[in-house]
Amino acid sequence: MTMRVAEKFGFRVNTFTHILEGYKVADRMKEHGAAASTFSDWWAYKFEVNEAIPYNAKLMADQGVVVSINSDDAEMGRRLNQEAAKSIKYGGMSEEDALKMVTLNPAKLLHLDDRMGSVKEGKDADVVLWSDNPLSIQAKVQFTIIDGTILYDASKNEALNARNEAERARIIAKMLLSNENGEKSTPFVKKPRRHYHCDTLGEEGETGENTH
């Protein structure tokens, strides 16, 4: 219906997000020129996605739809490489096409593929180097490079962690050896962690706060 309305009024839907049942209308999406941004394997967690399947991304891609893998979760958003790999497991997608769903394809959806999404001369020098195949759960980030500058180096990070641990041990030892009683401490009050997701406003009202 959305695509019919768009065509009636002379515009095109660029991307359908959270389209967990997109496989049902993938041919129509291709005809319309719409792309898809979907979760990898979420299904049946609410009525609207009762018929979602983990083959969704692959089936849409097979119809020629440009597909990206997304997440609105703070934790899962850090592991989209592993989320993309699920389409290899479930749908038999090639590794190259799976990687595109979290690199080049999202850039295409945002119309930024002229400067990001792939390693090519003239594009932004934003690169992540892994210890293994980035689609493997064993892979660890070795380097993160933004605009050609190394912002994360795993070996240096280990050295920093060791230095911080030694400093922590030194401070604790000094505290234990001190004869001073010090002032009365303030009771520790744990602040709830704020966690935002796509349904936060609907669940928590206008404040947009959701605590766990």
Predicted regions and their residues:
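Conserved, well-ordered alpha-helix/loop/beta-strand core segments that scaffold catalytic motifs
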Residues: 1, 5-9
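His/Asp/Glu-enriched, well-ordered alpha-helical/loop segment
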Residues: 27-30, 34-130, 139
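C-terminal recognition in membrane/secretory proteostasis and scaffolding
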Residues: 134, 172-212
